[in-house]
């Protein structure tokens, strides 16, 4: 049984044909591609929130080549380590075009997986991977999930709202938080910027019990121009390139990059 909730009243919603309804008769229609739009207009900052189509297409093309599989495997290993034998409800928060979500479903095929992103374009792309995931357009500040119903929330390089994590996770539920360390994709920063500004991670730490935290460093060799440009386009750095530096892209034939991330597992209180 899914744990979907109405974003207006947070009551459970049930499927009736091609729609989902709550007890207060709020109704949401399934899209033709089988995703559910649970994003309310007040939750939108723009008419088309989220990443651009160019960025999403580049992201899908790059990730499906397996360059970031080491990250997916690490998240999967974390879930395997901390799960029990009961069926799980797992939300992939800010799932984008669905690559990691699809990977979770392939491994945890008997569990219920949700992929949520604020971008309708991203979720529509995600449905092409599989229809066995609950693909949701929604806002991390107003998760369309019933209270205290999730076993795991995965959050990879995405904005989160701690109050919503507390509300939707079960007692003893887990958050797998993946964040970029200062040297993540350092080669791209050196390519684009005259000066690299190192950001502190002091605001990234969440207000939950830390169960485990470790750094993952991995070298990746990209030996063709197309994949290198796709990596650039899926990062915000590409859109910050100064005009006088754009010439470096014309000469880009290959790229060696460093994956340098922090994986932190948090747990909510069991009391």
Predicted regions and their residues:
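N-terminal auxiliary segments of SAM/dcSAM-dependent transferases
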Residues: 1-48
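Class I SAM-dependent methyltransferase Rossmann-like catalytic core
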Residues: 45, 50-74
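Conserved class I S-adenosyl-L-methionine
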Residues: 86-96
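Conserved SAM-binding loop of SAM-dependent methyltransferases across substrates and taxa
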Residues: 97-109
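Conserved SAM/SAH-binding beta-strand->alpha-helix loop
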Residues: 117-121
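A short acidic, Gly/Pro-enriched loop at the edge of an enzyme's catalytic core
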Residues: 141-152
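Conserved beta-strand signature within the Rossmann-like core of class I S-adenosyl-L-methionine
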Residues: 172-182
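Conserved Class I S-adenosyl-L-methionine
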Residues: 217-271
